[in-house]
């Protein structure tokens, strides 16, 4: 099915197979045109509209195929603006904002002025192939847009894009192969989304109702099982604040081996519950001279400056900056830190709402210390943490599989869309 190409020619866009052509987009498309936005102040242009109206967020929120839009316009709105009907199976291309975002519309649509509708010529250029060519070069188009005065692309620039043009049948085969990979990625994404919904439901049920309870009582944090108690964080955890050693002193940072965790490190975990490394590390000298709080593994780190509420459990002893607080348990016999990490993640919105500050939100040490939390029996804490951790592991495995497929797709795109590897037709 595949073979390695041996015969290449040099072109403006690099080496391509001898039997491929280089063409400008305008020469292989029937139409390349931006849309327009009907006046939002005119109700008749939008009320009970039936024409899907594409904005950039519709493209960024879709995968390869666009099948729906958030907003719809009326015929009157269409006729009183620069919007036009883009036939289905055309290519939509963003010129502003998220430059280079691309989709194929599976329904007839109108677009706003930030989006080009591109209709390829029949029997010359396949929409599916064009989609992948544009997607492959997205970063280049984005940089190109940033070089213009307006920091955007325009229709004239896009019309002059030079693209490789393999024989039509080969275009179809290339698109078919890449579509199969995209379908695999989409299946995994759906599975991840399903698991995340399951986890959300489990967190709500387990962290408020526990496991196997039939008797409940009212409390300051809502209805909880009868044998659960309510305490403030300071009753169960020692709360420590973080700091930043002087960045002007290299002895505090150079060849540092001690984790120095920031809210950014926590935000990069996504849904993971554990953290074992940080982007920047400090030295033992910094630890001694700057009175940094070093807290043991198994402790909780929570971001308390914008963004508030990112939480993780340490897998190694670490220190942290002033955007975080460290919580380590006072009594190991009654606390499972994984349970409380999940509980604090579950209460992220409430913690954000408690945060004060006009410039940026911050959860003070006293606010966190006084925050009320439940205390279930230790074995139940462990069971709840184990269930949620198991779902997290499943999600993480799916994400790793998705990332592997995405890496594979990128390599295959590079080989097929440059003609280094050919598809037999």
Swiss-Prot record:
Subunit and interaction comment: The type I restriction/modification system is composed of three polypeptides R, M and S.
Record region (Distal conserved region (DCR)): 369-418
Protein family membership: Belongs to the type-I restriction system S methylase family.
Known function: The specificity (S) subunit of a type I restriction enzyme; this subunit dictates DNA sequence specificity. In the presence of the R subunit the complex can also act as an endonuclease, binding to the same target sequence but cutting the DNA some distance from this site. Whether the DNA is cut or modified depends on the methylation state of the target sequence. When the target site is unmodified, the DNA is cut.
Target recognition domain 2: annotated segments: 209-368
The protein, known as: Type I restriction enzyme MjaVII specificity subunit
Positions of the UniProt region annotated as Target recognition domain 1: 9-168
An individual GO BP term: DNA restriction-modification system
Organism superkingdom: Archaea
Keyword Coiled coil attributed: yes
UniProt-listed InterPro entries: Restrct_endonuc_typeI_TRD (IPR000055), Restrct_endonuc_typeI_TRD_sf (IPR044946), Type-I_RS_S_subunit (IPR052021)
Entry note about domains: Contains two target DNA recognition domains (TDR), each specifying recognition of one of the two defined components of the target sequence. The TDRs show high structural similarity and each forms a globular structure. The two TDRs are separated by 2 long, conserved antiparallel helices that form a coiled coil structure. These conserved regions may act as a molecular ruler for the separation between the two recognized DNA sequences.
GO molecular function, one term: DNA binding
Keywords: Coiled coil, DNA-binding, Restriction system
Region of interest (Central conserved region (CCR)), residue spans: 169-208
Pfam families in the cross-refs: Methylase_S
Annotated SUPFAM superfamilies: DNA methylase specificity domain
Additional free-text comment from the UniProt record: Type I restriction and modification enzymes are complex, multifunctional systems which require ATP, S-adenosyl methionine and Mg(2+) as cofactors and, in addition to their endonucleolytic and methylase activities, are potent DNA-dependent ATPases.
């Amino acid at each position: 099915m595949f073979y390695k190409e041996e015969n290449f020619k040099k072109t403006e866009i690099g080496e391509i197979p001898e039997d491929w052509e280089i063409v400008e987009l305008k020469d292989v498309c029937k139409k390349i045109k931006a849309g327009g936005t009907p006046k939002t102040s005119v109700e008749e242009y939008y009320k009970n509209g039936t024409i899907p109206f594409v904005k950039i967020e519709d493209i960024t929120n879709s995968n390869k195929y666009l099948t729906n839009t958030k907003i719809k316009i009326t015929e009157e709105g269409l006729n009183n603006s620069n919007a036009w009907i883009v036939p289905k199976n055309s290519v939509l291309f963003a010129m502003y904002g998220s430059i280079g975002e691309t989709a194929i519309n599976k329904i007839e649509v109108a677009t706003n002025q930030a989006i080009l509708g591109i209709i390829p010529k029949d029997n010359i250029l396949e929409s599916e192939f064009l989609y992948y060519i544009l997607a492959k070069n997205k970063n280049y188009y984005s940089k190109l847009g940033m070089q213009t005065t307006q920091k955007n692309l325009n229709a004239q620039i896009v019309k002059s894009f030079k693209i490789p043009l393999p024989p039509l049948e080969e275009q179809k085969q290339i698109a078919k192969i890449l579509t199969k990979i995209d379908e695999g990625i989409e299946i995994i994404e759906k599975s991840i989304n399903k698991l995340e919904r399951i986890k959300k439901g489990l967190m709500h049920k387990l962290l408020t109702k526990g496991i196997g309870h039939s008797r409940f009582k009212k409390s300051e944090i809502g209805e909880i099982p009868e044998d659960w108690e309510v305490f403030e964080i300071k009753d169960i955890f020692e709360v420590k604040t973080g700091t930043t050693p002087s960045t002007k002193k290299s002895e505090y940072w150079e060849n540092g081996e001690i984790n120095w965790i920031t809210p950014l490190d926590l935000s990069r975990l996504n849904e993971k519950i554990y953290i074992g490394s940080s982007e920047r590390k400090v030295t033992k000298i910094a630890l001694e001279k700057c009175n940094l709080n070093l807290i043991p593994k198994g402790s909780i780190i929570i971001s308390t400056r914008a963004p508030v509420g990112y939480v993780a459990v340490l897998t190694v002893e670490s220190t942290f900056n002033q955007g975080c607080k460290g919580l380590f348990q006072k009594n190991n016999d009654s606390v499972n830190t994984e349970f409380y990490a999940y509980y604090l993640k579950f209460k992220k919105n409430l913690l954000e709402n408690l945060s004060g500050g006009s410039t940026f939100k911050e959860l003070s040490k006293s606010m966190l210390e006084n925050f009320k939390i439940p205390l279930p029996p230790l074995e139940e804490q462990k069971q709840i943490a184990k269930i949620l951790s198991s779902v997290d592991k499943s999600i993480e495995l799916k994400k790793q599989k998705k990332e592997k497929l995405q890496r594979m797709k990128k390599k295959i795109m590079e080989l097929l869309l440059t003609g280094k590897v050919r598809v037999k037709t």
